[in-house]
Structures are given as C-alpha cells and as structure tokens.
C-alpha cells in the first residue's frame, strides 16, 4: 500500500492528520528526529506549513509499515486525539495485539527504531528502580529478550538496508569493501600475514574477511582491534556495516553489539557508568537491567563494542568541564579489561599517535580504500543502467587522475555522483577537463544544488561561515542554535547535513547536526575564505599551512583542517576563477589577487626544507592549483634525495609526488623507510622517468605491494637502484619480480634484504643475473634460504661472467657484479680465436668468494675445491667460521696452488689444531705464490695471502719504467717476492721446536722464507736456544719475532751470538720485561711482521734504512759480570754496530766496566743508555771517556737517566761535543768537570743547561774556562743566573778574547749561551733580553761596555731600559776607538716623539754613523763611532746655514748637527709625520741638510702628510751623495708622489731606488722617468705594486737604455699585459748587466712570453727570472723551454701559477739538463701531473737548492721519483710538495742531505704507514729547521717516530702537525721526545682529536705543545 492509495481512500483521515500536526509542530519535529536520525528534514521552513508537514509524513511513511505504525501508536498515546479519529487510525495503521509476543516468538522485524519507541513509558534510568534477585533461568530469559530487542532495534535503525557510501542509498549487496591490511604481530589465524582482506569480485565472501577482523589470537588480555584509515576511507561505513551484518545474523560469534560515535560521546556532561552507557545512552532493557548487565559480564567474550572516531575523542584537558574525557575513560577501562573483561573492542581512527588507553598488544588494521578492481566494482554498482555503467567505466579507464582520486571511497562516491550528471550530455573524455582535481569535483557537486544554474550564493557562503567557525573552534557537531533555519533547510534539501539524537546525560536528549563528511565542512570553509569580503588576504593566507603528520605522533587528537589548505589551493586554480567571481559577486581582479596570494604562499613553502609529511601535503596542494609554473618550481626545488619516514602513504600521495616529478629534469632518489604503504600505491609511479633510486623498507609491504610495483618498474627508464627491504615478500611476490626485472636492463643495484624468500625464490632471482647486464649488486640477505643451495650459488658465481664477488655469512647473501662493458672481451668468428679470447677473459676476470659461518664440513670442502678449480682467477676465498677442522684445512691448503688465488685464502675459525698447523705448513711447500701465512690458534686465525702471478707482476710494472731507474740496488733486491709465516698464539712448547722447524724447512724448500713470527707461544729459554741452533737450516731470513715466549737472560746471550753467526741478522731488539724479541735483516723495520705487505711502488719503503747492525736490550738489570760477558759477545759482531741498553739503574762499577770495554769494540758507532738511572758521579765518568776512548765524538747525559755516545772511526777529526743537561750540577762540580774535559783536544760544544749553577757556579766556570779547549757553543740556560752574573761576565769579558757571541734572556726561557771562536779578535756580540737593570747596574754595564774593546754589537730587548737610562748609557759609554752598534727594543719607542729620540741619540759620546727607527716594531738601532771628532767652526757654520733654526729646538739643532755630521745611513720605518706643527719633519729636514755623508735613506710603512713631505723633499734635494733611497709602502696621495718625484731630480748618484706601493699617475710617472734619465749609475730599481699598466710600461721602457748599469729590475704587481711586455722586450737587450728580473703577478699571456723568449738569450748575466702568477699557459712555457738553455748563468726561475699543464711542463723540464748553475725551481700551482714529475726526477740539477711544487697535481709515483732524484742533490735546502695527493708516495730518503732546512708536505693525504719512513729518517737532515706536515692523516705511529728523532734534531725550529689524527697518546709521546733534549720551540697540534682538558694537561706538562689556534696565530 503506497502513499497515493492512502490519500485516495482516506483523504479525510490524512487531511485531519495534517491539521493535527500543524498544531503540534515541535512534537512532530522531535518524533521525526527520533525515527529518522540520519535523514535530512525540511524542519527549517515553517514547520506549521501544511505542505511541509505533508512532505515529512510522506518520508516517514516511506520508511516502511513498521515505522509508520509505531509513529501512529505514539501519536495516539501522546497527543490529544479524539476518539472518533483514534479508532480509524488504530484500525488502519495501529499495532497488532501480538506485538508484545514478537520478541519471544523470534521474529526478525520490529516496529520502530532502536532507541525512541515507547515514549508513553516514562523514562527510568538504570539504577533508579529497585533491583530484584532473579534466578538463573529468569536472568537468561531477560537477557534473551534484551538481545533480541537489541538486534531488532539495529534492524529497525537500518530500515532493512545497510548504509553505503555517502549521497547514495545502497542495498546490502552493493557495499564494496576497502583494502584492509594487518599490522603488528596479531594476524588472523586463518589468513596469511600482510594479506589484504576482502575480495571485490566476490561480495558474497566478504563476510569471511570481516570475520577475520575478530579471528586473531589475543594473548592474555583484552581483544582490541584498531582500524586506521585516512579521511574518506570508509571507516564509519565499515563500522555500521558490521552492525548491519550482526543484525542480519552474519556475525554469530557475538550475542551483543554496541556502536558508539565519539563525536556524540563527547557531548556527555556527566560521567556515566558502563551500564548507563549501554542502557541509558543506547538501549534500555524492558525490565531488570541488572540481570541483563550481569549476563553481559558473564558472556563478555561474545560482546562487541565499536567506538567510531577515536581521533575525535576529547581528552580531559581538551574542554573545561569536570567530566571531560569521561567517554575516553570508559573506553580505556574497556580496552584494558578493567570493565567487562573479555569483551571485544573495536575502534576506528585516522593515522597518528594512538592514545595511551589503547593497549600496545592491540591488533592494528590499515584501511587503504579502493584499488582498481574495487573502483570498477563500485562504479558498476553505483550506476543502475548498463549504458551509464559503460560510459562511467570508460571515463575511469581513460583518466588516470580520476581513477586515482577514486581510490578514496568518499571521493569515489562524489565522482560517481558528478559523472551521473555529466555523462548523459558530455562527450567521451570530458571528465578529464571537468574533474581534474578534488576541488573541481566538489565544485561540480555544488553546481548540482541549483539545476537552473543560479547559485544560492547567500546559502553557500552562510554554510561556509558555519563550517569555518566549526573548524576554528574544533566543532563537528552543531546544535540548533549554531545553524539558522534557512541554512538547515538548505542542508537538508541537498543532503549536506545529517541529524541525530544526542544523549548528554541519562534522561536528557538533544538534536545534533553535522556535515555528512568532515571534508565537506572543510570545502565550504575554503569557499568562505576565498569568496567572503569579510576575510582579508592576510587572514586568508594564514590558513595556507602544511599539517605535518609528525604532529600526529605527539598530539593526542587530530586537527580538523587536514584538507583545508588543499581546497584553498584548488580554489586558487584558474578554472575556479569565474565561479568565485560569481559567488563573491566581485570583479576578476579582486578574486585574482586572492588566488595569487595563495599561490605565492605555496611557492614560498616549496622553497623551504620540509619534512616528508609536509612535502606530501605540499604536492597535493600544488596539484590542486593546476599551475604549471608552480609545479616546475616545486620540482626543481626538490633535493636530490627525498626521504619519507614513518608515516602512512596512500596511492593519492604517491600520485601527487609523481605529478611533481613530471616537471623535474634532474634525477632523484626516493626513500620510503618505515612508512605504512597502500598495497597498490606503487602504481602511481608508472612512467616516473626521473627516479634513479627507489627504496622501500616496511613490514607492511607484501606480495600485493610487489605485484603493484612490478607494473611500474618497466616504465621507470632511469631507475638504477631498487630496494625492497624489511618487507614480507614471499614466493608469490617474487614470481612477479622475476618476470619484471629482465625488463629493467638499466638496473645497477637490487636489494631484497630482510624478506621471506626461500630456496626456490633465491635461486630464481640468482638465475636472472645474466639478464641484467648493468647490475652491480644483488642483496638477498636475511631471507629464509638454507645451506643446501650454497653450492648452487657458488656455481652461479663461477659461471656468470659478470659476478665478481659472492658474500655469504649466516643470513647475509650478496652478489657483487661488474657490468658487461667492463668485463666482456671482443669475440672473433674463428673457433680457435674464440678459445683464446675466452682464455683471456678467464684470466682477466677475478672473483671473490666469501662463504663464512655456513657450517661447511670436509665433504663440502671437496665439492667446493672441485668447483674452484673450474673457476676463473679467484681474488679471494674466505671459508672462515665453518667446521673444516684439520683434514678440511689441509685439503683446501693443498689445493691452493692450483686454485689461482690472487690475494687471500681465509680458513679461520675452522677448528684447526697444532697438528693441523704442521699439515698446512707442509702443504705450502708446493705453493709458489704464497706471500703470507698467519695462524693463531688462540684467535682462531688461519689466513693465507698470495702474490700475483709473475707474468701479471711484469705487466703491472710496464707503465712505471721511468721510476725503475731510481730504485736502488738494495730496493730492487727487496722488491722480489717475499714469504712471511706467522705462527702466533699456537701454544708451541720447547718440545715442539724440532718438529716445527722440520715443517718450516719443508715449506721453504723451493721458496725462501723471509719473515717468521713465533710470538706469543711458550718456547721458553730452552726452546729459543734450540731454535738458534736450528736457524741456519731455515735459510737467510729477513726477520724473526720471538716475543712473549718466556725468555731468560741466557737465551738473550744466545741470540746475541746470532749477530756474528748469522749473516742475515743485522738488528736484535730485546725487551725482557715486556718479553719482546725481534731479529731483523738489513733494511727491515719492525713492521716487517705486520699483516699488510707493501707491493708495487710501496716496496720502496723497504729501502735500506740502516747500513749498520744494532743491538737493543731494554727493561733488564745488568750486573758487572753480565756486562762483561755481553761486551765480549759483541766483540765478535761485525760493524758498524749500534747498541742501546735500557736498565732500571746502572751502578758506577757497571758503568766503569761498560766504558772500559768500549775500546775493545772498534765497530761500535753508537751507544745509548735510555731510561737508565745513573749516579751523580756518572757525568765525570762520561766526561773522561774522551781520554779513555778517542773515537768518541759526542757524549750527552740528560737528567742522569739518558746517555748517548757517538763514535767516529776517524780519530783525527777535530772537536767533540759534550752535554750534561739536567744533571743537578752545581758550583762544586765545575772544577772536577772542567778538569776531566780539559783532556780533550778540542771541545766544539758543551751543554750544561738545566742545572744548579747560579751566579756562583758561573763564576767558578768562568775561572776554569781557560782550561777548556772550547771553540763552539757553551750553553748555560736554565741555571738561575741573574743580572749580577751577567755583569760579572761583562767585567771579565776582556779576559776571553775568543768569545764571539753571548746571548742571555732572563725571561721564562732562561737562555744563557756563549759562542767561542777559534780565532781571537773576531768581535763580540752581546744580546740581552728581559734583563732589568737598576741605575747602578746601568752604570756598571756602561763601564764594562767601555772596557770590552772586542764588543762590537749590543742588543737590548725588553730590558725595561727607559729613556733616562738610555740617555745615561749612551753618555757613559766611551771608548778610545772603534765602532759600537746598539739595538734597542722597548715598548716606549712607539710613544716617544721623533725629536725626543733624536735628542737622546745626540747625548752619545761617539759620532752617530747609522740610525734606524721603527715605531710600530718598537725598535731603535744606532751605530756609534769612537772617538768623537770635533769639526772646525767653518764647516759647522756651513752645515747650519741650510738649517731652519727658527724653532723651539734650535738649541738642540747645533748639538744634532754635530752628532749627525757623519751619519751615513738613516732608516725610518712605521713612523708618523702627521704632526700639525711639522716639528718632526723639520727636524728630519735639518738632519738631512746637515748630513753631508749620508748615502742611504729609507722611509717605509709610514704616514706622511703633504706638509711633512715638503720638508723631506727639500732635505733630500740637498743629499747629493745619496746612493740608496727606499720610499716604499707609505701612505701618499697622487700630488704627494709628484712632490717626491721632483725631489729625485738631483739624486744622480743613486744606485738603489725602491718605490713600491706608490700611486704613480701619469704626471708622477713622467717626473719619475725624468729623474731616472739622470740616474745613470742605478743598479737596483723596484717599482712593484704601482699599477703602471701597459701604457706606463711603454713610457718607462723608453728611458731604460739610459740605465746601462741596471742589475735588478722589479715590475711585479703592475697589471702589465702582452702589450707592455712587448715594449719591455724591445728594450731589454740594452741592459746587458741585468741579473734579476721580476714580472710576477701581472697579466702576461703566451704572446708576451714569446716576445720575452726571443730576447732573453741576449741577457747573458741573467740569474733570476720570476714570471709567476701570470697566464703564459703551455704555449708560453714551451717557448721559454726552447730558450732557457741559452741562459748559462740562470740560477733561479719561478713560473708558479701560470696554468701550465703536462704538455708545457714536460717540455720545460727537459731543458733543465743544460743548466750548470740552476739552484731554484718553482713551478707550483700548475697542473703539471705525474708525467712532468717523472721527467723532472730524471733531470734535476745536482746543484739544486730549492724545489717548490705545491698544488701541482702530483701523485705517489712522481713524489717517490723526485725524492730519489733529490738524493743526488747534496745542496738541497728546501723541498715543497704541499697540496698534492701523495697518499703512499711520501718521499723516502736514504742518503744524508746535510743542508736541507725545510720540508713542506702539508695537505697531501699522507697516512701513518707512508710517513713513518720519512719520520724515522729525519736524522739524515741535520740542518732541518722546518717540518710542515699539517692537514694530513697522520696518527700516533708517526708521532712515536718523531718523538724518537726529536732529541737528535739540533736545528729544528718548527714542526706543524695540525689538522691530523694524532690522539692524546701521540701527543704524550711527542712531549716525551721534547723532554729528552729537543730544542724545538713549538710543535703545533691544534685540530687533532684531543679533548680540551687533556690538551690543557699536556700543555701544562710541556708548554712547547701548542693546541690553540689563537696562540698559534700570535707566534
């Protein structure tokens, strides 16, 4: 019966019903909301309107008869209905009498909805009625009735249908399940972990998937399921679907199901109990709720509670009410089993951080929306007619973006809704234009609101205002007060709002309204923001933000504006322009400005560095704008590597990313780590040609994900690296990859690490290797493969030509490959040629096989050996960690000679025993390529290292022919193959010695054994003695290590005999306490037994370091008898011999015996006693050694514990050195010491530093000094000598005419040194620093200076000598004749005026001949000539006639003129002449005028005003005898320069003129040229840094012929180009005396260089030519190379920084063979390369002094060649190879270079191993002053070597080790080296890995260690 028949048959009844309800509109509205909570009603339009009531009754009637009858029943009971009308109403539509029996009868239908029937029954809350005690049967009956009521209520709510997707009614069969994916460990019991749930092709079977949601195994705890999905995925729909299924009886495991929404529960104002939540707020039992609740508790395992929208739950701190968060509290108690224990709880939520109330063991299910099949299934169900279905499906299949949007079920519904409107009247494919974005999709939906195309602008904006207000306040549920009736009607008409009843507390109900979907609320809010004139642009752009999903991990509740920025971006699209203009009723400019503002914000965001989630949201926004320029900008702003970590990504997210990548040109790397990924999302990457590296790492990636990925991989043409690690891929997923990977031939790396692959899948993947020609790595580690496939893997590695390495270790399985282009050889057609080619390929290919910890046994070894024999050359075989044991190791070792192993065979950790060791040794007898065998049973180490085949070695050396000529004979001999055997920690005893030696003899029958290591065994003294007897049978070794074998002293004496009995033993090192014993051959260091062995170029390190034998015995206690026996044993040793002894202490008797035995050791060259405590008498015993043994040339005893004696075979050599620093010597020891030393023939050096002499000891020493035949340095530093001692020395100075220099400093350095000369009368220099003198002491000083006639120079530095004291000193010093120079450095010099200084100098008793003042440096120099000669009055008057005496200093002038009359040299530096009155300049003018003998005047680095310069110029104009003038580096203006040039016109006798850094303009240059034309005697002209340029050079060149005597010409830094150079070249032949020519730092190219090259041969005297820092290039260099041999006198040339390459460099150095005098070569900062270096090494001039090649692109080979060539240059003083990549090519010197002062190897990437040889051989350079090793990779090993040699480097002043890898240990060693006697003032160590506190501690112990950059810069 339909509504139409009702109206026809009961027209009067229907009309009366309308009239009745018109009078009760509020009652009708309440009932409609109760019966129709989810439907939208016309309640906003005049509720009393009969038409509205009529329409509402029709909707109610359409719900079915059960609902309609329930409504009529409530109408009759609750309203005042007349009896005459009630009877027909009840008779037609009323309930039957048996309604009360339906529940018991079990019928499924129920009249009325679930919550609101029975309004006649008064409300009674749970707990308000008295509880009655019921029997078990009654309780069961009551529960049964309630459960049936609960089910029928659910059926009634759904009205027989299940809610489907939004906007469209659906039947139960039309529901399309989304893709579900399990997470965590709680997978369904009957489903595969990681599988997706739900089959879109079989809707009937979907119940099985839904059932799986509740079939997982819960461990002792609550059964909680969390369903996670982004907005629009269908979480709420699935929740109601579950309730519908349960109501239909399809979830039979649950008796009761309760469904709650958190958005409604948030409205509860009073904290409910669980029974109140279930009964009062959901459905109340008809009676006895206590019994029903008790039943539910007892059967909790069959109760399901669903809570929808956990992300919307309010926390206790979210609102201000006391009961806030009460619903979440109940939810938490349920989840943790505190309430209704055992029940099932399910909740839905958007992704993010779950509240703490969710148990960690809860099952998590991800909802991913629709895949392609589900989209098509949904479209098919949506459209009822076949034509519409076909059209819609066609649109979906042709529009990938539309299909991608439909992956979100909510958007799929909107899309279908829009297509239903568009398809009938549109052409195919039009959806791509009309629905390109989500925003456009929603706009199409909005346009359907008004079919007449007239938009309801006011309603839309009003709706948007409500939506925005809700977003701003966090409101999704609105009340009647929030929405106006008009808007409510608008929302109801267009299905935009949904209404429902809300229980805020028991017994209280309200009506709530909400948007049908939160995204719709965001869309209307975006419309309002873009179109409302009440929102300005600043407010608008504040909403364009990116919501980071990382925030979701820290916030308990999501924000409500996830899609708002995307909608705003979409509305900023040009396609929305007209719509917004119409909606806002504004012009295009107004709308355009707002759209542009949004685009600008997105552009700024695109330029920033964003987190992964924000980047994804930005890509969505950019896609919505449809702005190609913004998309391109965003794409180009991406980093080269995009990483996304730990947040969910959907197909839509990757589609947005792919859309951006389409606009990118450069390749990109994509890395997805720990991100939950939608199974079909890789399909979005189809065609992404910009992706070069793609990596996925997530446990949620399974087979379905792999299948989807395989559809994309073949379309990604640039993909080189693919990673699918940490996933759950099984055989099913691998089957797709196996089919796909061959289609990706460009792949270089594939990683399937940590999946679930088994043997068949692994083998299938490995078999793909030949089909991937560019693959370099395949990683299959951490999968489920077994040991049974190991041989198959090895076979593949051997047979596949591209495999170069197979690594298997426990769970690791990695293939490394070489691309085909690198390994394939050319093939020819003939079969025999093919065979040769394949042989060559097998020989060239090398393979590494690492099969570690694979449980291999001897039978496996047999199979492997068989496979190995078929393989190409094996580079490495590693079988460590297996179970081969003795027989297996022997088997593999015996086969080693046939396996062609190039490098290493590792059999470690295989259970080898001592017996097995002998097996392996004997097996090695047939292996000719064995280089090293290392066996350690304790460490389970068995490693065999092999050398290359001889033919390969020869081939590898072909390219190094130039270097071979430099290899010394010793080195060539050592470069042959060397065999090393190390048997350490093997437990060998003395009884094993013979057996061991027998095995060793067997192993070296055909190949000599070079290095033998038997350390860390238990041979003992007996075993070692026996071994020394058997050593001759092992042949000539190069080293033997017997450390840690428990040796005795007898064994040591036995080993000492080896120095004489075994010819190969050159060095014996013994440390008894630490039990270290080394026997070494010639040229072998202790490193010989290290695992790494040098080959190739590095073999040069084995060059002969020592030519003498050495014996080192440490940590022992030597008694007289032992010493006697030891010396007797050493007598038989051939020499030369070096002996080093280290004892805890050595008695005087023992020392005497040792010294007495020295004459019997004529071969002894060095004796050291290190760390040996000696007595206080030992200095006298050692001082007497020169008389006892004349061969001793040097004795040093430091701190009574370090003694060194040097011997020389030439006893006739004059001069010996003796030193006793730190030996506590005092005045009482001086006489005895001098008596012993007086027996020397000649004493060249005596070091008594750091003793206790004091002033008295100095007196004693000076008294004994005449006895000493000293002719060198006497060092008394650090002896606490004071000023009194200095004065005493000066008093006695006339008694020592052979003292040449005295240097004293009373600062913390405490320097006191005297230098004696062999000849008398050479003059004495006295240097005093920080020696403060009192006035009385100044008088004594002056008296001594007057008496010491031999004193010629006095230095006073910081001696606190003030101006009065200086005046007194100058006045008191008076001599009968001679010269005395005084150098003064005091702080007050810069603060005293020039007249004051002049006045002081005028007080001198002698005549002033030289004067030099530097104010900034605070230095004063003057030279006095005695006696003071008085001039006659006539000459005095003549000199005064030119002077300006009209000054206040006129009284001084007469005295100055007299004092300065004989002044010959005047130098003023850093002096200011800016005084206003010109006093200083006038005074200087008068001095110049009066100094008729002045020959040299220098004024440099000074401030000179124009007025002062006028005075100076006037004075200079009268200096007619001036020969030298230096006016460089002054601050002058152009007019000042002209004034100065004018003063030069009369200086025709000048020989030297320096005018650097002057502003030489055209006029001043013209004056200079005019002056130069008169200086015919000029020899030295410097005009550098003047910017003369080409024009000025042309003018200058014109007068050069007038300077025939010119010898030195400097034009550097003058911007001279090729034109100026050509002018110079034309004139230079007219300067025949030119010797030094400097054109550096100009702009000369190859053209100018060609001109120079043409005339340089015409300069026969040219000795130095500097053309550095120009641009001559290779062409110019070749021109110079052709003419350089024509310059016979050339000594120095500098071509640094000239862009010279190998072509020019090689040609240049080839010309060096013609030079006889060349001393200096500087070619740095050019790209010379190795060819130039090797060529230069063959042609270095033997007289070379300086070689500078920094930053020249040199390599190791060139550096080694140069080092060997430098050994043939005995005069070399400086070598610089800095900033070259030398690595292992550090210069290795083996010959003495006596003059070498500086070595610069900074920033050369040098490591310890390469630098140790250089450090150890620094003693070959006795004159070395600077060692620069900064910026390398040096560590503690080099520091240790340096510490050893520092005490022997007497001239070393600078050691730079900053920016290295030296630790605190290395610094401590360096400190010890300094303490032992090094004179190095500082070692720079900053920027090394040393902690600040450790550095401070070390620096406090040894101040010469510098760890501070600041301190360093001040040095």
UniProtKB/Swiss-Prot annotation:
One of its GO terms (biological process) is positive regulation of type II interferon-mediated signaling pathway. GO terms for cellular component: centrosome; cytosol; nucleus. Residues 223-542 form the NACHT domain. ATP binds at residues 229-236. The keyword Repeat applies. It holds the Pfam family NACHT. LRR repeats lie at residues 622-646, 716-740, 744-771, 772-796, 871-898, 900-923, 930-953, 1006-1033, 1034-1055, 1138-1161, 1162-1184, 1240-1263, 1265-1292, 1348-1371, 1481-1504, 1519-1542, 1552-1575, 1576-1598, 1603-1626, 1631-1654, 1659-1682, 1687-1711, 1715-1738, 1741-1768, 1769-1795, 1821-1845, 1849-1872. InterPro entries: Leu-rich_rpt, Leu-rich_rpt_Cys-con_subtyp, Leu-rich_rpt_typical-subtyp, LRR_dom_sf, NACHT_NTPase, NLRC5_atypical_Card, NLRP_HD2, P-loop_NTPase. Induction: By interferon gamma. By LPS and viruses (at protein level). GO terms for molecular function: ATP binding; RNA polymerase II cis-regulatory region sequence-specific DNA binding. Belongs to the NLRP family. Probable regulator of the NF-kappa-B and type I interferon signaling pathways. May also regulate the type II interferon signaling pathway. Plays a role in homeostatic control of innate immunity and in antiviral defense mechanisms. PANTHER family: MHC CLASS II TRANSACTIVATOR (PTHR47189:SF1). This is Protein NLRC5. The gene is Nlrc5.
